Amino acid sequence: MIETLHLARRGERRRESSYNRSGANRDRVVVPPGEAHAVPVLRGPGIIRHIWLTVLPETPTCYRDMRLVIRFDEAETPQVDVPLADFFLFGHGLLVDVNALPIQVSLQHQDAPPHRGSMNCTFPMPFSRSAEVLLANGSGRPH
């Protein structure tokens, strides 16, 4: 992919973000207990090329409580349904630095709150008609 980065590609690029539409600097989504946050449905054909997120957990169990759910092309069963910890390669809910292609996790060390980091995934995830992405909270507290 990097060897063709300089070449023009056909297609439309889109991005979805949690930015605060009011203009305030509170660009985040809080997912209530037992609920899910849905990214607007992507219509295709297309490819999800990058997922980036960070979580402000009160406890380290947040990464086991929160599930990433992805369904392609209106499938009955999601193709991805996994705790964030497993998807981003830190087992037992222990947040650690990960530097592996295509997963990267960077902890915020120093004065940052504990259990906090930035998570990136660059798995290319193609779809023909649609892609639905949810972040589901299976805990008893908001995340």
Q: What kind of region is each of these model predictions?
A:
Residues 1-143:
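Beta-strand-centric surfaces of beta-sandwich/beta-rich domains
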